[in-house]
Structures are given as structure tokens and as C-alpha cells.
Amino acid sequence: MKFETWEPVYEEILRDFGFDRAADERARDVAAEYAQAFDLDRLSGINGQTVAIVGAAPSLTDTVERVSGADVTIAASTAADVVREAGYAVDIMVTDLDKNNDTAAELTHEGTIVAAHAHGDNIPAIQSWFPTADRSNVLTTTQAAPIETVDNFGGFTDGDRAAFLADAFGASELIFVGWEFDDPTVDNMKAQKLAWAEKLLYWLENRRGE
């Protein structure tokens, strides 16, 4: 997805949450200080494939075996741990570095691609995590305008960014595993983010004709 298409939605998200665009841009620029140029040809294996988009909902432990029906598995945040513990491979991890950062770093050293996201309130995590990772396996992303070493394929939360990434590189089918949009256990901010994830995925499905 081109940024020109994403930007109006991004601006709506900023208004809804009261987020500061300049803060996102600062985080992007800090991440760029650590990021290496990523060879996007490494994502060509997504093209024409069935891709599992794995969320970290509590139901994941009971449904994780569904990833076996996919050609490529993209796991969001702590879903990567559940997938691996169940004996399945994670091909790409998507994270904004707010939880299982040791897993994210370990995956990069194993050669797995980690899409690490920079946004307005995770600059300290960026500064502490990037030096621990094999940066040749880090795809650095932003929700603001992309720059040379920091990409934007669309999406807001870890989970929906995984779906937008798969779409951007030509996935033929998306399988959603471990997703719950109505989770009474989460706080108001998380509930608002889940509502946006649902809205964004509906938009993406319409764009894909699904």
C-alpha cells in the first residue's frame, strides 16, 4: 500500500487517539539510526501463497494448529511464542517491541525476519532492542511517512500490520488465527486499538475483494 493511500486513515487514527504525528516521526528517525536497508526481495515468497496471520488472543492456544494449513506464518507479538512452543515455524514476526523482545531478538539471530515497528511512545524500546538484534534480519517500519530504511505497508496494531504486510507482497489468501476483537479482559486503550484493527482488516478485505 502506498503511503498516499494509507495517510488519510493514519490521520484519522491520530485524531481518534490524540496521538502526535511528530512523535511518530521522531521514533521513525531514531529507528533509522539503527536500521539497515532491508532487501524486500526476501519477502517475495509471500506472493501467491496462503498466509496465516496469527494474533495473540487467548484462543490461540486452542487453534494454533490452523497455521499448518498455511504456506507462510506471520505472527504478531507474543503469538510468536505460542506458535513456536506448539512446534510450528514463524516465518515473520511483527512487533512494536512492547512485550517479548528477547524472542524477537532471538528470531533475528536465527535468520527469521522481524518487522520492528517505531511509533511515538516506544523510542526507549527501539534504543535498547536494536543493538541486541541481528539487524540484517530486521524490517523496520513506521506508521508515519516512510524513509529510506524505514518502510510503511499500512496497518496500526501488530496484528493488522501483519495482514497489510502479507497483502503488500501478494498473498493470495489470508488465514486469521488467534483473533478476538471483543475481549472483555482488556483495558479501554486496548479495546480501542482492537476496534481499529477490526476496522482496518475490513477495509483491507474490501480492497482485496474478499
Predicted regions and their residues:
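Short beta-strand segments
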Residues: 53-55, 115-117, 141, 176-178
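Short N-terminal helix-initiation segments at or just after the protein's N-terminus
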Residues: 15-19, 57, 114-120
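A broadly conserved detector of short glycine/acidic/proline-rich loop/turn motifs that flank catalytic sites
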Residues: 58, 120, 144, 180, ...
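A glycine-rich, hydrophobic loop/mini-helix early in the fold
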Residues: 45-49, 53, 57-66, 70-99
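N-terminal donor/sugar-recognition subdomains of glycan-related enzymes
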Residues: 1-51, 61-63, 173, 179, ...
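Short, flexible, glycine/charge-rich loop motifs used to bind or transfer phosphoryl groups or to couple energy/partner
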Residues: 41-43, 61-65, 103-105, 165-166
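Acidic/Gly/His-enriched mid-domain segments of enzyme catalytic cores or analogous surface patches
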Residues: 71, 80-171
